[in-house]
C-alpha cells in the first residue's frame, strides 16, 4: 500500500501519516515494523541480502566461487520478486527520489559485502581486500544496470532471466581470479 502511494504521488509527496491512514494502522505500529519512512523501501532489499548471504553460505563446495555468486544473486532475486508484488517497483522510487538515494550506498555496501565475504572465504583472504570487493562491485553494476534497464511491463521472469544472462559473462571472466585449483 505504501509503495503504491509513493508511486502515485512520489516518495517525497507521501507522509508517514498518509501511509498509516491508508493502511489503517497507528504510527507506533508503522515505526515498529519499518523504523523509518525509507525503511518501507529498503526492508525488502535487506531481506534479499540476508537471503543472498544464506545462499552463498550454503553453496556447494565444489562450485566455483563466481558461479556460486551468480546462482545466489539470481536465486535470491527470484525469491524476492516473487515474494512481493512491488519488489522491483521499489527501485523505480530509489532512482527517482534524491532523498532515498542518500541512504542507498549503505544498503548496496551490505549487498556487496555479502558477495565479497563469500569470495574471501573461498580464497582465505579478507572481505575488504580489493579483489573480492571489485568483483562484488562488478556484480552490483550488472544488477543495477538490469534494474534500470527494465522495461515497463516486463514480467518478473524476463527480468530474472536477463539478470542471469548478464551476470554469466561477468562472473565467468572474474572466476579465474578466485580459482583455488592452481
For each predicted feature, which ranges?
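An amphipathic alpha-helix adjacent to DNA-recognition modules
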Residues: 3, 12-13, 21-24, 33-70, ...
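Residues within helix-turn-helix
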Residues: 17, 28
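Residues that scaffold, gate, or flank divalent-cation-dependent active/transport sites
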Residues: 87
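C-terminal peripheral helix-coil segments that are non-catalytic and often amphipathic
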Residues: 117, 155-182
